Amino acid sequence: FPSVQSNAAAYLQHLCFGDNKIKAEIRRQGGIQLLVDLLDHRMTEVHRSACGALRNLVYGKANDDNKIALKNCGGIPALVRLLRKTTDLEIRELVTGVLWNLSSCDALKMPIIQDALAVLTNAVIIPHSGWENSPLQDDRKIQLHSSQVLRNATGCLRNVSSAGEEARRRMRECDGLTDALLYVIQSALGSSEIDSKTVENCVCILRNLSYRLAAETSQGQHMGTDELDGLLCGEANGKDAESSGCWGKKKKKKKSQDQWDGVG
């Protein structure tokens, strides 16, 4: 009975909103596994309710146990499968919202990169950025900054981009990702959208991917660290890299601000 399953999942979503004790109890009763199983259901309404419940269950740093439980249930691949196949905008917003919430848990950053990076890039970030459709630039500007899906996806990648050298390598090598992120920023220049959360996410992803770029890329190893660093920082007007706010001590201070749980 799909309607019963949908209503039950929707009730769990309502029940656990803002209540960490109930969230933990749902996990102990096996509810996360049951909700993950519903992501492969044939009915769109069931997908919508299951995603809404999962989004609430994994919201907040206090619920990292729920995030890990979702991962252990095969939840990340299930979310990716649903994102790949659904055309329902609300479900796409919910799926990317769940992934953004999951991405604040350090233990899940690499699993998200392994299972979700390619689909987030190819199914969300590139098409929503407008990078491949530059002749429609004005229309795309309106769409990309009002896109909750793009905001969620860039928020997720912003968090996982801080997961270390292997994470940075995979993201740098993800075809089209950096181009699309740069296009989002470029399209916002000179408009009020320059202060949007989506643009902020894109800037922070690129900042993290530029960290130790010379030392970690074959081009940098070939040219020598000092030479490539000079090229990268040529517009810094002689300022120390730390004082530029891209890495070093300032990055450590801002780490907690760069990791949040998305849309709730």
Swiss-Prot record:
Predominantly expressed in brain; accumulates in cortical neurons (at protein level). O-glycosylated. Residues 238-264 are annotated as: Disordered. PROSITE patterns: ARM_REPEAT. Its main location: nucleus. Coiled coil: none annotated. One of its GO terms (cellular component) is postsynaptic density. It comes from the Eukaryota. One of its GO terms (molecular function) is structural constituent of postsynaptic density. Keywords: Cell adhesion, Cell junction, Cell projection, Developmental protein, Glycoprotein, Nucleus, Repeat, Transcription, Transcription regulation. It is found in: Nucleus; Cell junction, Adherens junction; Cell projection, Dendrite; Perikaryon. ARM repeats lie at residues 20-59, 64-104, 120-162, 166-211. Pfam families: Arm. GO terms for biological process: cell-cell adhesion; dendritic spine morphogenesis; learning; morphogenesis of a branching structure; neuron projection retraction; positive regulation of axon extension; regulation of canonical Wnt signaling pathway; regulation of postsynaptic membrane neurotransmitter receptor levels. Binds to E-cadherin at a juxtamembrane site within the cytoplasmic domain. Binds to PSEN1. Interacts with ZBTB33. Interacts with ARHGEF28. Interacts (via the extreme C-terminus) with FRMPD2 (via the PDZ 2 domain). Interacts with PDZD2. Interacts with CDK5. Interacts with CTNBB1. Interacts with GSK3A and GSK3B. Interacts with DNM2. Interacts with CCDC85B. Has a critical role in neuronal development, particularly in the formation and/or maintenance of dendritic spines and synapses. Involved in the regulation of canonical Wnt signaling. It probably acts on beta-catenin turnover, facilitating beta-catenin interaction with GSK3B, phosphorylation, ubiquitination and degradation. May be involved in neuronal cell adhesion and tissue morphogenesis and integrity by regulating adhesion molecules. Functions as a transcriptional activator when bound to ZBTB33. Belongs to the beta-catenin family. This is Catenin delta-2. It comes from Rattus norvegicus (Rat).
